[in-house]
Amino acid sequence: MASILRRGDSYSVRFKYKDHAGRICEGWESFKTKKEAQDRKISVEKELLDGTFLIPDAMTVAEMLYKWLPIQSSKHKWAPKTYTHTVAMIQNLVVPYLGKKQIQKVQTYDLEQFYATLSRTPRGLYKQGVKQTLTDKQKRQFLTGASIREVHAMLKTAFSYAVEWGLLLKSPIPREAPKSTSEERAIWDEKTMLAALQTMTDPTLHLAVHLSMILSLRVGEILGLQPGDIDFDAADGRGTITVGRSLQRTEKAALEKTDPNQIYHIFPDQREGSSSALVLKKPKTKKSSRTLYLTKPLKEELLAWLEKLRQDELAMDGRYRNCGQLFRLPNGMPVAPEALSKWYRT
């Protein structure tokens, strides 16, 4: 039962409840008028009786997200890249703005205002939770609507867990996600593709772009290919290539906190003391594993490329470190995604 006490010019409702650990605690709520206190006495007694009383908890948004993160990662068997990306969202897009706010005090309006703030926030303003000094040009490059929708989706999931944990009666997340405007990407026709390939003199870049254009492969899928994935005699001699893995660079800390079954292989460090590693991982979805047909020009280029790899190995005179990938550096080590992207930009 609850009781009402007068304390100076206000009235307090006193009651007892059990916290999440089962300990008996005493609650106090103050009101300006006796009528407000009487109404609250009736409602709190009903809540305590039917189990709808919200146990007070000072957990902050940051604490809740870092509690939710490993559970969600383990439950859904996240890839290391997904884990790293989610940590970055929490550190750089949520904690600086909502991190210290207690989750039981977060209102839907607060989140609407938060999304509005993000829409005016420059990309890269925070890195690893530390505010950066930006150039005038960088200050004009704002977060995309897609990034804000991604934050919304993450918070929606995390706050639903808080409800399940009994920390909230209902989620404060707005029903509608922030709107996102998508820009149409220009699709190259065959003539444009051929013209682009003719300007590329680097054989590694040429083959990578050729694979991307003809087979619609992502960078990670291209670099994840191995010579054994190619069957030059399949499809009545047309030839096929099978996509079944992806190569990514990921933080070593993320590898320790994600499902090891998602990883096929971790390549040795090329730089001593590196905090990241190149890994071969499972494809994003089951549909990502597929077998594709080669065109005649692509088949010819792949045959020439395999011969180049053999010549590279001979030229290294025993110092060649065959990583087993289709795309390799002259010393046999794998080509990293960031290296391929850099070559493409230059």
Q: What does each model-identified segment do?
A:
Residues 127-145, 149-151, 164-227, 235-238, ...:
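Basic, Lys/Arg- and aromatic-enriched nucleic-acid-binding interface segment
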Residues 57-163, 177, 324-326, 341, ...:
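Short, Lys/Arg-enriched alpha-helical recognition elements, typified by the DNA-recognition helix
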Residues 160-169, 304-307:
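Arg/Lys-rich amphipathic alpha helix in sigma70-family domain 2
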Residues 7, 192, 225-307, 318:
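Conserved tyrosine-mediated DNA breakage-rejoining catalytic core shared by Y-recombinases
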